[in-house]
Amino acid sequence: MSTSPHPHPNLGTITAKAWSPTPGAAVRQAATVVVLRRAATGMQVLLMRRAPREGDIHSGASVFPGGLLDAADAQGSALCSGLDDAQASAKLSLPHGGLAYWFAAMRECFEEAGLLYAAAQDRSHLDAAQLAQIAAQRTALNRRELTMGEICTRFGIHLAADRIAYLDHWLTPPGVPKRYDTRFFVAEAPQLQVATQDDHETDAQQWLSPAEGLERRKELKLAPPTYKILELLQRLGDVDAVLAHARAQANVPCTMPRLATGSKGLRPVMPDEPCYAEIGHVDPEGHGHASYDLAPAQALRLSPRLIRITANNGSMMTGPGTNCYLIGGGDRNEWAALDPGPSDDAHVQAIVDAAPGPIRWIFVTHTHKDHSPAAQALQRRTGAQLLGMAALHAEWQDTDFVPDVPLAGGERFDLPGDSTLHVIHTPGHAGNHLCYRLEQERMLFTGDHVMQGSTVVINPPDGDMGAYLKSLRALMALDLDWLAPGHGFLMPQPRRAMQQIIDHRLKREAKVLQAFGGGGPYSMDQLLAAVYDDVPPKLHAMARRSLLAHLLKLRDDGVLAETPAGLWGKAGARVPGATAI
């Protein structure tokens, strides 16, 4: 029996009184069973409540039955039937020893919940009398007066490994005092048996639908793996679908939350959160100093040569706010500011305060009013040189930005702190848009060319959809590890991120072409309703600008044509007047 039977990462927000991050904690192996049953109202799942223990932050948490692997589990795996070690190890992506996890999961389920997944030597099911005799040994097993292997031998049974299926894999984040590498299995509740708590490790149990468990998440003190698995069960819907899903999985990825701090204190961050990859980059050992918030005016050190400050201009269009990056350092302790942001005295002060040394250069990606207007104020405060490209169109631009050093793309700057900045002209979002590659970190500062969590607005005449896609494809040829966007956290897998943007734009383009199935001509209003029927009306003003960008690209490609009356039809077709879509 495990001394810590419920290996889940920390619960919700963690208070400093509970514990502090502990980098370097050893990782222990564990196994858990998600037990399901069929009820009149649908699928239900078994949750056990952890008994209270002094100093245990998991006391009272509702969990699936499970616990640590014991040394005897490796030997006990010889008493499993329906699966051999080679098959089990392959499912877990282990070289060997995989069947011990199956044995441990079934042992723990019997110890804690009184549910036994076992079969007679001839693989037949056990009858009620046999099950009652074995159940009587549960107390001795929990007292360690007997082992599971001894029970199997005494009663001539095998643990039925083929009756549970591998479902999920979770690893406690670095920094948590007790770390667990936990394999989650799933099974239907065995026949002729009733789940009961052991009144030692667990003091209560209940059957709930996944929806009920999720609704009561806080009350039940569900740990991240528990509620994430409940979400999966809810999506799949019924017992058969869950078991089929588990058995069909070829590779089960390992999910590891990461610790970070922010407005809600120290908490685990899930891999699907935008900040996850950055947290791993900034704080791989789990000291807890990385942030899951982009808080205005707070400087965050992303590397020895890189600091980020976010402006207090968050909105639907700017996301959490515009990022300003400080690049440099080294022996000279001199810095460059990239994208100083909107005209905001408090933000300019925050940039000055964040710089460990004098700011000598101010680089700008483009002259939209959330990126460059602070350049003049920051220059007045620091005497720094302005570098970038002046606005090519007056509309929606910061026309006051006049660079001391005009850039066209292709330039390289050797900055302090062994920091080499390569300038790349990337028209599309704006005609004067520049991206900057920090060569030593294989990082691209994308401005608005790539944003986290949304697609950028392509707004003609300065915005050009054809140029945008061409620029993206050119960037995909670069050797990059990270994107540093003008809005959002650091982004991993740059090629994948850019390909997703291209795919999204081309999917929308295909929808534009589909709207011309009847030939046309069509008005902008007709096309907007057909092409952006998946976009809320409140966003249709911006969608209209993107639609125009698509139409202009297709016109330049020779696919569509615009009439003098402002209608759109297929190139070469006669277009006397607007028709209905």
Task: Label every PLM stretch briefly.
Residues 1-296, 301:
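N-terminal leader/linker segments that precede catalytic domains of diphosphate-processing enzymes
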Residues 211-213, 332-344, 412, 420-511, ...:
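Metallo-beta-lactamase
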Residues 365-371, 429, 487, 550:
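Histidine-centered divalent metal-coordination motifs
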Residues 296-354, 435-447, 452:
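Conserved beta-strand hairpin/beta-sheet module of binuclear metal-dependent hydrolase folds
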Residues 36-38, 187-189, 327-331, 415-417, ...:
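Active-site beta-strand termini and strand-to-loop segments that position acidic
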Residues 315, 320, 342-422, 442:
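Active-site HxH/HxHxD metal-binding segment of metal-dependent hydrolases
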Residues 287-295, 514-581:
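C-terminal regulatory/interaction regions
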Residues 305, 351, 487, 512, ...:
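Residue-level signal for inorganic ion chemistry
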